[in-house]
Amino acid sequence: MSAETFKADYQGATVCPSPNFEERKDGAKPQFLVLHYTGMENAESAERLLCSPEAKVSAHYVVEEDGKVVQLVQEAYRAWHAGESFWRGVTDVNSHSIGIEIVNGGPLLNFPDYPEKQIESVIKLCKSIIKKYSIEKRNVLGHSDIAPHRKSDPGEKFPWENLFKAGIGHFVRPALISGGRFMTNGESGRPVEAYQSMLALYGYGIDITGSFDERTQLVTKAFQRHFRPQKVDGVADVSTIDTLHRLLGTLKSLT
């Protein structure tokens, strides 16, 4: 489709049209909100890439470091931000989501902190989208949640707890890291099967095999980045399992 200008869906956003979008498949509506970091040097380079026809990537919004919000794709259309992904049985996450790219260098710039003003804008934008589409708290996600085998954004420095305190997403206070039993790559048995079942029940794409394989390790890292960021090592320790168990226990109370 052509990159024609349009009226911003979000009040206060600046429009910078990207040609990288299409119709949502089968009339799908947004039910997920996916947050990314750009992983590039600055906003200008990220927006240039997201608007390049050759790149074939995009997002609905970019939030710059100073809090400026730029809309690239209208919310009605399918932006190309999720790629090969999965959440709660959905494999075409692009058709079912709104994507927000948050300007942050990630590993390129040694994982800088997210500025407070930027996070304030992210919160306001998320609230608007969540209200408009009645997005469930459990469906406010990081890219690594839906693609743990290939993505790590928005990273362990992203302040998910701050968003939760503002009414966005699902979160519980992470359990303290201590000693005790743990499961790691190469182990197998019923405890591993039970752990995989809990991850799958929450929404992650994982096969319940009873074997702690590379996929299980990657999903564990994704879970830790979002919900137990103090230590991201892919080991299912007591803290990780307890945090996951308490998240599942609060699902019924979510609105």
Predicted regions mapped to residue ranges:
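Cell-envelope/ECM-targeting effectors and their regulatory/trafficking segments
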Residues: 16, 83-86, 115-141, 145-255
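Active-site-adjacent loop/helix surface patches within enzyme catalytic domains
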Residues: 2-138
